[in-house]
Amino acid sequence: MKTKLAILSVAALFLTACGGGSTESAPEATNDVPVVIQNPADPANAGFYIDGIVYTLVNGALEQPIEDSETNNVFKLLEFKSSGDINADGTDDTAVVLINDAGGSGTFYYLGILTSGPAPIIENTTFLGDRIDIKGISFVDGKFEVVYLDRDSETSFDAPPTIEITGIAELDESKTSFNFSCRDNVGICL
């Protein structure tokens, strides 16, 4: 009898310590693939994959402290936005322009694309340039195009950008990533 009581006591302690009375299930295992929130209708609260890191905006911005610095790493969505069905699934996708200012002299511009559908494209941004001047963004012939002014490699960043460039984003044949290209009139885009 004492043995049964001892075993039941140990079992009760074990179940209590291990949460045996809980009805919650264990969290599902995850892999190392980054999760990018892809809601084309709400780019102000979406994730953008830049340089191997997913930055998720909240109300169009994200501000993070920089280690060993008094400045912040700031991401901000600009007013430039276009919609179109780049992945041909019957639902519009969205392209936006966002900037990254890490407190130095540069302001880095990116084209970000948010796709609809069950399989979002993780690498959804491309670098456009540093201290450029965005003119507009549109959806043309199944591709997103962003028009901006930039400088050639010989021109100082102190001078305003004057060379018009059209950045082009299109979905690859497998519909798993974007191909980015550009065109201009002076040979910057090769």
Enumerate the language-model features and the residues they cover.
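Flexible low-complexity loop/turn motifs enriched in small/helix-breaking residues
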Residues: G19-S82, I86, T91, T115
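Acidic, small-residue rich beta-repeat scaffolds with periodic aromatic anchors
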Residues: S22-T56, K135-L190
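Sec-dependent signal peptide recognition
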Residues: K2-S9
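Beta-propeller blade termini
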Residues: K76-I86, I132-E145
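Acidic/hydrophobic-patterned starts of short beta strands in beta-sheet-rich repeat architectures
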Residues: A88-L98, G142-V147
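C-terminal motif of bacterial Sec signal peptides marking the signal peptidase cleavage site
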Residues: F14-A17
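Short consensus segments that form the blades of beta-propeller domains
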Residues: N72, N100-S105, T155-P161
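Repeat-based blade/solenoid architectures
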Residues: S69-F80, F127-I134, R183-C189
